[in-house]
Amino acid sequence: MSAFTPASEVLLRHSDDFEQSRILFAGDLQDDLPARLDTAASRAHTQQFHHWQVLSRQMGDNARFSLVATADDVADCDTLIYYWPKNKPEAQFQLMNLLSLLPVGTDIFVVGENRSGVRSAEQMLADYAPLNKVDSARRCGLYFGRLEKQPVFDANKFWGEYSVDGLTVKTLPGVFSRDGLDVGSQLLLSTLTPHTKGKVLDVGCGAGVLSVAFARHSPKIRLTLCDVSAPAVEASRATLATNGVEGEVFASNVFSEVKGRFDMIISNPPFHDGMQTSLDAAQTLIRGAVRHLNSGGELRIVANAFLPYPDVLDETFGFHEVIAQTGRFKVYRAIMTRQAKKG
């Protein structure tokens, strides 16, 4: 997060306008401009744990991570700079939350890549902070308005759910596969053996569907789930509770907050971070797994078939197996042996 995103580069064209402002940065914060822009005061709120990690190192307590922002998170701010995400329901959740807390008269800036659908911000905020486009560059749009009316925000209204083979999956905006089980996860689930025992870690757990499906036919497993996304953490907790499954769920940047070793690590790792394609998380997952697997333990992941994971698996574990595949996806399995690098 050292190079600025195109959206931040557009904002920097207007940096003089922000020098006297007390700014709250929120949304898809993929760089450290909130810590570096010259302002009267800066705060940041994010639902992404890895973004918070970077910003908190430079901003301390002025960078906050949570599902729902509170009045304390926006205190004394007179300007909102919101980075539009690729997911419109996610933007609506975050903006309605923030605008319900900020005082009438707050300056509102919305910036984002055109391909992310940022222009729909105009319609979304029409009743609260009518926006006008004030700049267009780097295939991004920058919109400005002033908060005229606070929306009423109720986080409970954003919950959704769907069923998978009799299990109820709870979801929130911004959670992967919010509207149904994705094909990759289906393929990974098909490979999980009933009556498995031991400690299982689900990395990038999303809504928790892999874990609850696994626990249904292997009730003796002890589950730990983690994700970088605050909505995913809350959705997984709700999914586990709804289905009567026990497990520990917490925010973590891959293994950053994970303690101990496990008998199995399962994952459908992301390769998109916001609008940017990124393989970093999956490579960190593979290389770091050896520090969190017991001897004889296994890493089992599903990935798009075109992604270059076999080389990283072989480099780390000494070998790998493909135990299921379709035209688009492969399920990889690697075992912790003495050949594996100890990280």
Curated annotation (Swiss-Prot):
Query: SUPFAM superfamilies annotated for this entry?
Result: S-adenosyl-L-methionine-dependent methyltransferases (SSF53335)
Q: Where in the cell is it found?
A: Cytoplasm
Q: Which UniProt keywords apply?
A: Cytoplasm, Methyltransferase, rRNA processing, S-adenosyl-L-methionine, Transferase
> What Pfam families does this protein's entry cite?
MTS, MTS_N
An MF annotation (GO) of this entry: nucleic acid binding
So what family is this one in?
Answer: Belongs to the methyltransferase superfamily. RsmC family.
**Which NCBIfam families is this protein grouped with?**
PRK09489.1 (NF007023)
Q: What does this protein do?
A: Specifically methylates the guanine in position 1207 of 16S rRNA in the 30S particle.
According to the record's subunit comment, the protein's assembly and interactions are:
Monomer.
Full protein name: Ribosomal RNA small subunit methyltransferase C
Gene name linked to the record = rsmC
